[in-house]
Structure formats: C-alpha cells, structure tokens
C-alpha cells in the first residue's frame, strides 16, 4: 500500500517546505525506500514558464521539457534523480482539465463543482505517481484561498486510502521578538488550529526559526498543537541547505516516519557529500533580477556544489550607465563572470559591456543561453565592427541580426510552453575546451529553454571550426544550430545555448562548473 507524507505550510511562505520535503525524501531513499515527490502549486498558471523570476524565482526546466517551480530543482539536486512534469501540479492545470472534460461531456450533464469534480481530479493525479512513499508538498500557507481545494482533496484522500497510510507534516515559523527576548509561538498555534478547522490534524510540526528554540517554547508548540513532543521538530537557520538532511537524520526523522507509517527501513551509510570548505574565488553573476537569489537558484547552487562560495549578483543595468574604465573597476574585484539566461532588453547592454571586459582582459567567463547570444553580439560589434549588431528580440529592424528567432518559432503565437524546451542532443567537437569539459564525450543531452539562436547562416564570417585560422568564435558544439561558442587564446571564454545548471546534483555538479573551478585553480 502506498504511503503518503503531506507537507503543508503555515504563518509564512518561503520558509523551507521544499528543502524539508527534499531532505525527507533523500533520507528515506538512503534507507532503501522507493520515494517520489510531488509539488502542488495553487496558482492558476498552467506552469511557471511565464512567471516573473523576481516574484516567483527561477523557472526550472525538466528533462521532458516542463517549466516548473524551483522546488523541483531542490528535489533533483537532493534526490540525485530527474523529475518530470508529473512531479508538479498547478491549480491552472486542474481547472483547465476539468473544464475540458465538461466541454467533452465527460460529466454526463452533472453540475460541475469544486467538490467533487476538482477534488477528484486532484486525487487522481496524486494517485498516478508511483512510489512506496510519496511526499506531497502543498505550496503557500494554510488559509490561502487558492490552496483550500487541495487541502480538501488530501483530506478526502486520507479517508479513502486509510489514515494509517498518511502522515501530515506542518512546516511553520516561530519568530523571535528581540524587544522582549522571547520566541512567539502564537502564530504557529493559530496556524495549526486553522488546519484543524479544515479537517486535517497534523502528525508532526516542523518549527522553522532564526535560532534554536528553547525547551519551554517547544513544549508550548506541542501542547497547543496536540502533537507528541518528539514529533515537534525545530529546524533553525543553517549556513547552507545541504546540512538539513544530516540534521534530520540525527533527529531520527526517518525512524519517526517509518514507525508512524509502518515502513521498513534498511541499514544505510548515508552517502551524503557536499562541500564544507570553499575556495576563496569571487564570481560575478551579471544579471537583472536583484530582488532574490531564487531568480538564479540553479546557477548559484551549481557553483556552490563545486566548492566555491556562492556568486554575487551584479546589476547589469548599473553597468549600462558606466564607461569601460568604470566597468573594469567594478569587475576587477571578481575572479570570473557568469552571464545567465533571461528575456527582454532591460540590462542587456550592461551584460554586453561585461562580456567585452572579460574578452579583452582574459577574465574567465561563462555565458548561458542569452549569455551565449550576447557573446555573439559583442563579438560582432567590437571585433567585426558591426556596431548595430543585435538580436531581433531586442531590435527587430537591426541591419545585423546576428541572433534571430528560430524558424519554427516564427509561426508560434502563444508564449506559454512553446519554446524549445527540455533535453536535446548536442554534438561536441574535439580540440575545444567544451570537449575537455565533457572528458572527451562527443554527444550529450542538455536542457534548453529558448526561442532565439545564433544566426550562423546569415553571418558565417563570425564563426569558425576548431583549428581554423583567424580570430573568430569557435563553434564547439552544434545540433541543428550553434549550441556553444568559445575563444582560443583565452583562459575560459565559453558560451552555451543550453542550461547546464539544471543538471547539477549534490555530489555531481555539472562538469562545466567543475571545469570553471579548475580554470580558477590554474589546473586547466
């Protein structure tokens, strides 16, 4: 019989339900349990593809081309396995499917309602995921109007599948009031009471806090939540999220869950390896989304997993207003640059200035997706003298469209879910840095998310094959179009059309980030 851990949130959003869910799943996997994870997002978007990264964080792309919430990135990195579109459910998907069924006459003339039609659709999708143990994370907080139908659905599911097969874990937050030097548990108490009114009684309360809670506060949470004291778990802030699985292991979380759900655990050596000492290199992530690190989460974590301190986001718009000397003064403080993907013209000219600086000053630089396209634009402008060179994304009338909309994209009018997405085959050419990155492998699959491509057909003079003469961009990888470019006689000037950051895992960061570290160490 399938077992379920339902993770809900209270008091605040963004307090770590995703990290807790991923850590719990990894812990159970280490003890031989066949585990899977489902993230439920109560928003009405069909997927995360058109959402603003400043508001929602990065869009994570799966192997099968699904544009997902960033929590799926946590699941992949922690579990060391790929997620698919089945690992994410949104309210938009559920409503859309129910309306489609109604139009098809699937409800036989019944009045279509939240209960039972939406709740049945939700339960069917939850049941469809195969696993011995399914961890279901419900986004948002208890009390959000968008999430009520999902809480009702899991309440019904518990009744249908048996209470003995369910564990409800409520992740909440206890603030520390500095004016009185005490923790305040009242918001957590009220959050649990609200969950109970919906018909769900938590079996476990995970208390997030800035500092470790004192014993009286923990006892108070247990008393007013009606949860046994040993099922109230405090998770204070940590230096990095990769400590959390070890913390939960030391608390015996896996044993508590196995006991409650009657799951058999196998002995484990807990093979969990992440960097604990860091090289003192400074990497500038030249981007425009400054509100939160979540906008570039997978890049930041990929760098961190190589044993380098997390990159600093440098405002590309700030660089736009600077001359070359001012740009140099800012970027000289860093050992390497990363130009990430993105959309729209805001901040683009600042990124191009950063690329010019890196090219002229032999500073290691990695361009990702848009970053690679901007490398082509910078080279066309400043080496070939095509001063008006641009992408048709930013200037549809440019006389030098060195980056252009892919041919198959020109017939597409909708934005959502229509880009070139997911894992695509990439051919790597020998005698290039990228060939060294992959250890001599000539064919790989990498994840993509783009509509535009380097316009090699119209501007072949910008590019050359490995080993050819002339100061041009070396095409180091191709599919039906250019997948990567680099420069000879430069420590590391590499641009890739794909997103390597999506494939990094704990203990196995993507090789391009590992190679960048080796360049900084002087070993390449």
Swiss-Prot record:
Where L-glutamine binds, per the record, is at: 342, 370-373, 393, 451
Could you say which residues bind Mg(2+) here? 71, 137
Region of interest (Amidoligase domain), ranges? 1-263
- What PROSITE patterns does this protein map onto? GATASE_TYPE_1 (PS51273)
Q: Which Pfam families match?
A: CTP_synth_N, GATase
Task: Please tell me which top-level EC class this enzyme sits in.
Answer: ligase
Per its UniProt record, what InterPro entries does this chain match? Class_I_gatase-like, CTP_synthase, CTP_synthase_N, GATASE, GATase1_CTP_Synthase, P-loop_NTPase
Provide the E.C. number(s) assigned to this enzyme: 6.3.4.2
Reaction equations catalysed = UTP + L-glutamine + ATP + H2O = CTP + L-glutamate + ADP + phosphate + 2 H(+); L-glutamine + H2O = L-glutamate + NH4(+); UTP + NH4(+) + ATP = CTP + ADP + phosphate + 2 H(+)
Anything known on activity regulation?
Allosterically activated by GTP, when glutamine is the substrate; GTP has no effect on the reaction when ammonia is the substrate. The allosteric effector GTP functions by stabilizing the protein conformation that binds the tetrahedral intermediate(s) formed during glutamine hydrolysis. Inhibited by the product CTP, via allosteric rather than competitive inhibition.
Can you name a GO cellular component term?
Answer: cytosol
Q: Where does ATP bind?
A: 14-19, 71
Instruction: Tell me one GO molecular function of this protein.
Output: ATP binding
- Catalytic residues? 369 (nucleophile), 499, 501
Q: In which pathway does it act?
A: Pyrimidine metabolism; CTP biosynthesis via de novo pathway; CTP from UDP: step 2/2
Query: What GO biological process, any one, is recorded here?
Result: pyrimidine nucleobase biosynthetic process
Q: Which residues form the Glutamine amidotransferase type-1 domain?
A: 282-524
Q: Locate the residues binding UTP.
A: 13, 184-189, 220
Q: Give the free-text miscellaneous remark of the entry.
A: CTPSs have evolved a hybrid strategy for distinguishing between UTP and CTP. The overlapping regions of the product feedback inhibitory and substrate sites recognize a common feature in both compounds, the triphosphate moiety. To differentiate isosteric substrate and product pyrimidine rings, an additional pocket far from the expected kinase/ligase catalytic site, specifically recognizes the cytosine and ribose portions of the product inhibitor.
Please state which protein family the record places this protein in: Belongs to the CTP synthase family.
What is the protein's known function?
A: Catalyzes the ATP-dependent amination of UTP to CTP with either L-glutamine or ammonia as the source of nitrogen. Regulates intracellular CTP levels through interactions with the four ribonucleotide triphosphates.
User: How is the quaternary structure described?
Assistant: Homotetramer.
Write the protein's name. CTP synthase
Which organism is this protein's natural source?
Thermotoga maritima (strain ATCC 43589 / DSM 3109 / JCM 10099 / NBRC 100826 / MSB8)
What are the top taxonomic ranks of the organism?
Answer: Bacteria, Thermotogati, Thermotogota, Thermotogae, Thermotogales
